[in-house]
Amino acid sequence: MGQTVTTPLSLTLEHWEDVQRIASNQSVDVKKRRWVTFCSAEWPTFGVGWPQDGTFNLDIILQVKSKVFSPGPHGHPDQVPYIVTWEAIAYEPPPWVKPFVSPKLSPSPTAPILPSGPSTQPPPRSALYPALTPSIKPRPSKPQVLSDNGGPLIDLLSEDPPPYGGQGLSSSDGDGDREEATSTSEIPAPSPIVSRLRGKRDPPAADSTTSRAFPLRLGGNGQLQYWPFSSSDLYNWKNNNPSFSEDPGKLTALIESVLTTHQPTWDDCQQLLGTLLTGEEKQRVLLEARKAVRGNDGRPTQLPNEVDAAFPLERPDWDYTTQRGRNHLVLYRQLLLAGLQNAGRSPTNLAKVKGITQGPNESPSAFLERLKEAYRRYTPYDPEDPGQETNVSMSFIWQSAPDIGRKLERLEDLKSKTLGDLVREAERIFNKRETPEEREERVRRETEEKEERRRAEEEQKEKERDRRRHREMSKLLATVVSGQRQDRQGGERRRPQLDKDQCAYCKEKGHWAKDCPKKPRGPRGPRPQTSLLTLDD
């Protein structure tokens, strides 16, 4: 017990039945292998501080949730059931989780108390802030911070925080005490962008995925109120994300999220760019944004007056209280995003695209997002363009994991498959992959079978060598025996060897056969004729 470390991830795996029950209560289904993959490999890459061992910190969980629920190609719909289950476990922790969750102040169960009665001027509630009502009691001892152009923008730091039912802050405390008190009892928001909102907030809704803090919103007197970026926001964004040169896509997605959720002013945009980009990167982004300005005919224009009107480099005198001023600001943000996207494109390098391969435990959806990002970064092609779907599909097949790629190549009627069909088929193959235990068992079984086949082949070869050796020995023995027999038979017919002075006729020594006295002398007689038998005989 003392030598094992319990982590949120290991704790959920030990109580997996409870996790599945909680997921079922959320009307979702979760798998253990993907639960581990998302917690240890996917979510730590979101740059929101998610540890590989998991966490029950509701603030971090909601930040991951905002990434998962992001619209468009930056979202992760396949991870929704898992982050929703994490959130449910952290929001209402079961008994085995409570020792690992820090106590939190319970928010007021009732909605914020709004002024009621026949008041002639009830403070309106902003549609963007359904849980907030602006203060109606200004503090005259604090001077208001007005904008340079004399507009109605005011600093909410000089006002009392919005009233909340059941909880309030003493008006005798200073601004610093009020900020410190609210920060300690603040409920985590569903986005990493939380520190711009001063004062107490209601707990986020279950389906909330974006921050409710905006630099510009309607106040109690019907005028826009300005809340600037806090230094902690800028610090966290800069340190928790890669540089623009290193990963322009990720930083562009962050700035796009900030522009969408915070509605920053022109000054806020300059502060944001100056913090997150280097001087050279900022100049490149501004240049590309000005190139994206379109004229009245809808085509890109280079007329200085039109470019300066749409995307000014100097502080404009836009009146944000008017619809015209807000329209200018919306167009400026759109051009700024276009500049970020165009400036983030590197020179065409298809080798970089081909170098993007699926990781061993990477889901096909995550791999496809990395592949599309490589297309956007290293090629002039838009991977979302229907005309490029074939190229992206082929890259997806060839650069997938080997087991997935082989099965995708063998699909029937592959040419008619869309990219979505390929991704769904790849997800099915990915989810049916064998577990590490099954893979280990299969490798062990294959090794044993291979060893048995090798031994059988060795035994067969040894037997063949023995048979061949036996045949050769048999032939050799037969040859030896036959030679010995022939030697014995030939030895009987051979004449004995004679000495140098021995007679071949009488075998006596001292003379040769031609001088042998025992040899008959005289002419040879005719040979007797051999009578031949005839038919008459």
UniProtKB/Swiss-Prot annotation:
A lipid is attached at G2 (N-myristoyl glycine). Residues 344-392 are annotated as: Interaction with host PIAS4. Residues 107-217, 434-537 are annotated as: Disordered. A motif (LYPX(n)L motif) lies at residues 128-132. Pfam families: Gag_MA, Gag_p12, Gag_p30, zf-CCHC. One of its GO terms (biological process) is viral budding via host ESCRT complex. Keywords: Capsid protein, Coiled coil, Host cell membrane, Host cytoplasm, Host endosome, Host membrane, Host-virus interaction, Lipoprotein, Membrane, Metal-binding, Myristate, Phosphoprotein, RNA-binding, Ubl conjugation, Viral budding, Viral budding via the host ESCRT complexes, Viral matrix protein, Viral nucleoprotein, Viral release from host cell, Virion, Zinc, Zinc-finger. GO terms for cellular component: host cell plasma membrane; host multivesicular body; membrane; viral nucleocapsid. RNA-binding phosphoprotein p12 is phosphorylated on serine residues. SMART domains: ZnF_C2HC. Disulfide bonds: none annotated. The modification Phosphoserine is found at S191. GO terms for molecular function: RNA binding; structural constituent of virion; zinc ion binding. A motif (PTAP/PSAP motif) lies at residues 109-112. Residues 429-434 are annotated as: Interaction with host UBE2I. A motif (PPXY motif) lies at residues 161-164. Residues 437-478 form a coiled coil. A zinc finger (CCHC-type) spans 501-518. The record marks Y129, P130, F214, P215, L477, A478 as: Cleavage. Residues 434-465, 485-518 have a biased composition (Basic and acidic residues). InterPro entries: G_retro_matrix, G_retro_matrix_sf, Gag_p12, Gag_P30, Retrov_capsid_N, Retroviral_Gag-Pol_poly, Retrovr_matrix, Znf_CCHC. This is Gag polyprotein. It comes from AKV murine leukemia virus. The gene is gag.
